[in-house]
From Swiss-Prot:
Pfam families: BRCT, DNA_ligase_aden, DNA_ligase_OB, DNA_ligase_ZBD, HHH_2, Nlig-Ia
Gene name of this polypeptide: ligA
Name of the protein: DNA ligase
GO biological process: DNA repair; DNA replication
Class of the enzyme per the UniProt entry, highest EC level: ligase
Binding positions for NAD(+) per the UniProt entry: 59-63, 108-109, 139, 162, 200, 325, 349
KW Phosphoprotein (keyword) present: no
Active-site feature positions: 141
Length: 714
């Protein structure tokens, strides 16, 4: 559709137009000078996004262009043309699935990025309906893949993608395998005979991190973000594969509802948006019911939006803003819709988490397992309030697959606590001066030849005494997720290594404090605190020690599983691969990795040395302060304010109980924090005892292990 030369021109023109603000357009002549170029670049980016699914600018940059065009057309309506991008919604349809017409159009939302936009929206709504104070329902804006669900006579009959808003793709078989979509629901209790519900398919952030952790360990590139992972999963041709992806569906709008006589129920029997979401919640749908707040007036709306922007990273799902809807559905017809969006709703978008920038150079880093990772140094760019100046390029295959070169313009994404990621190279912006990336043949740290094991995508340094590996292993051992040694962070570890104080993990427990106190930046107090933290780490539960050993593929969850099934860490040297595979969370690859680690004499020697230095390698009575939770199984859901979920789980286990990640009839308690997930509903359905956070704190407050007391806020 576009030649390479034309694409290059449009990208260059995009950069120029992004510098233009609506205040710069003062006359009709100013508008006429840019409006066709503006439409051309928006059409081009629509094509890249919706047809190729391969955008070259961020959503924020696109919205800047789109809003500029809308502003010009609103001020000079005589310049509007029937084919303007503002007059239609682009399509993402392919021929892979049958097409189906929605019962009600699935329009986009108008976007706002500041308080002024929200106040202007409120002004228009108030003027249109003649009411001084409007009641709004405000809820999180999920960053997933849009779907519509149709139920007839209480039965699920169809699921579809958004498509062009009028026609979508029928993906019913794939939707049926998503466990949070009820296959039947008693809508008839509310007089509803046929209903269409709009929703979003998502992947929980923790699940997404697990998927990416596994992919990285296998040498595969991580998925860019939960949204792309969810959208890609929905379009798989095999529903059995879809079922494996851990997808969840949230519903957030009833777009069509009629009784058995065909009478419309929206705006009369279903009068308020908040109440309609409550109905869906009570019928077993996953919805933002507990997150929705009904706000009187725009000031309350703005406060709630800002509150969520501050806590967005604590929410279990990726959200990119808030949706503000007029709560009274009976006003919707009076407010109307445009060809693009309803006038009764608007999205408040959080700060952008994508941006384009240039690769300056590439360096190669060696990790604790010897994996050599290429890291691109970037022209610094702000993404979501954080300045990003480097990004991992994963491995050689990732570089080749995306054809990444030094000097390239790249689209970077940083979502929540997900590490920055190269979404794509803007090849259309290339000038011919870009240089291919040459992967080294020798370790950049120790000079040993690099090897690429069969079946892996990662080049490795196999010299276990490689300085870079040693330092990274020590950093990991002392980290928060492992032995949690405060004051022994990355900077101090690197300094101590350079000075010869640290050459192995056991060296942590024989640091020369008399020499450290003489270093710049260290005083009597800081050295005493460091010594105390190191001494305290000797009594960590053995699951933390197992984590700290840095066994490949073994994270916190697997380490806890191993610890539950042994008395001493050294016991694992007597386990066979088959024994290990019988444990939950341990498959063939992980079992072999554990087996190999404990059959390496150097590793056994290190564990024995740690034991001689006073590190607890066996379960001792001291590890369980009191067995008040003996025989009890706890499951945690939602965000706790008293402590992290990991600390809560550790307290339960130190008190003799078991912390599980799933709810069953054998579960003793489900502890519910803020924004609980599906585990809460499952507990209710199974009759499992529910504890709120206050009840849980009451149970543990007099029994918290000493070394965890400063991590719990009572």
């Amino acid at each position: 559709m576009y030649t390479k030369e034309r694409e290059r021109e449009l990208i260059q023109r995009t950069k120029e137009l992004l510098k233009i603000k609506k205040e710069h357009i003062k006359t009709k002549e100013d508008a006429e000078a840019i409006i066709e170029d503006l439409r051309d670049v928006i059409r081009y980016h629509d094509w890249r996004y919706y047809v190729l699914a391969n955008p070259v600018i961020s959503d924020y940059e696109y919205d800047q262009l789109f809003h500029l065009l809308k502003d010009i057309e609103s001020r000079f309506p005589e310049l509007i043309t029937p084919d303007s991008p503002t007059q239609r919604v682009p399509s993402e349809l392919t021929k892979e699935f049958p097409q189906v017409k929605h019962l009600a159009p699935m329009l986009s939302l108008d976007n706002s990025y500041n308080e002024e936009d929200l106040r202007e929206f409120d002004r228009r709504v108030r003027e249109a309906v003649g009411i001084d104070i409007i009641e709004y329902a405000v809820e999180p804006k999920f960053d997933g893949a849009g779907i519509s669900l149709v139920y007839e006579k209480d039965m699920f009959v169809r699921g579809a993608t958004r498509g062009d808003g009028v026609v979508g793709e029928d993906i019913t078989p794939n939707i049926r395998v998503i466990k949070t979509v009820p296959l039947s629901a008693e809508f008839s209790v509310y007089g509803i005979d046929r209903i269409e519900i709009r929703g979003e398919v998502l992947i929980n952030k923790e699940k997404f991190k697990e998927i990416n952790h596994q992919r990285l360990e296998e040498g595969l590139p991580p998925l860019a973000n939960p949204r792309n992972a969810a959208a890609g999963s929905l379009r798989l041709q095999d529903p059995k594969e879809v079922a494996k992806r851990g997808l969840e569906a949230f519903v957030y709008q009833i777009t069509y509802a009629v009784d058995k006589d065909g009478n419309n129920l929206l705006g009369n029997k279903l009068r308020y948006h908040y109440d309609s979401i409550k109905i869906l919640y009570e019928l077993g749908f996953k919805s933002p019911y507990k997150e929705i707040k009904v706000c009187r007036g725009i000031d309350e709306v703005i406060d709630y939006c800002r509150e969520w922007e501050r806590k967005r990273d604590d929410y279990p799902y990726e959200i990119d803003g808030m949706v503000i809807k007029v709560n009274d559905i009976s006003l919707y017809d009076r407010l109307g819709v445009t060809s693009h969006h309803p006038r009764w709703a608007i999205a408040f978008k959080f700060r952008a988490r994508q941006a384009t920038t240039k690769i300056i150079k590439v360096v190669f880093q060696v990790g604790r397992t010897g994996a050599v990772t290429p890291v691109a140094k970037l022209e610094p760019v702000e993404i979501g309030g954080v300045t990003v100046s480097s990004v991992s390029l994963i491995n050689e295959d990732f570089i080749k697959e995306k054809d990444i070169r030094v000097g390239d313009l790249v689209l970077i994404e940083r979502a929540g606590d997900v590490i920055p990621y190269v979404v794509k190279v803007v090849t259309e912006a290339r000038t011919g001066k870009e240089k291919p990336i040459q992967f080294p043949k020798e370790c950049p740290s120790c000079g040993s030849p690099l090897v690429k094991p069969a079946g892996e995508a990662v080049w490795r340094c196999i010299n276990i005494n490689c300085p870079a590996q040693v330092v990274e292993r020590i950093i990991y051992f002392a980290s928060k997720d492992a032995m949690d040694i405060r004051g022994l962070g990355e900077a101090n570890i690197r300094k101590f290594y350079q000075l010869g104080f640290l050459r192995s993990i056991p060296d942590i427990y024989r640091l020369p404090y008399d020499k450290i106190i003489q270093l710049e930046g260290f005083g009597q107090k800081s050295v005493e605190n460091l010594k105390k933290a190191i001494e305290e780490s000797k009594n960590r539960p053995i699951n933390r020690l197992i984590t700290g050993l840095g066994i490949r593929f073994v994270g916190k969850v697997t380490a806890r599983t191993l610890a539950e099934n042994i008395n001493c860490v050294e016991d694992l040297k007597d386990w066979s691969v088959e024994d290990l595979e019988r444990l939950p969370d341990v498959g063939y690859v992980v079992a072999h990795s554990i087996y190999d680690f404990f059959h390496n004499p150097d590793n056994i020697k290190m564990i024995q040395e740690l034991k001689r230095l006073g590190v607890q390698t066996c379960k001792e009575k001291e590890e369980v302060v009191e067995n008040i939770f003996e025989g009890k199984t706890f499951v945690f859901t939602g965000t706790l304010s008293c402590c992290s979920r990991e600390i809560a789980q550790e307290i339960v286990e130190r008190l003799g109980g078991h912390a599980s990640s799933s709810v069953s009839r054998k579960t003793s308690y489900v502890v519910v924090g803020e924004n609980p997930g599906s585990k809460y509903r499952k507990a209710l359905s199974l009759g499992v005892q529910i504890l709120d956070e206050k009840q849980f704190i009451e149970m543990i407050k007099d029994h918290i292990p000493d070394d965890l007391k400063d991590k719990v806020h009572l």
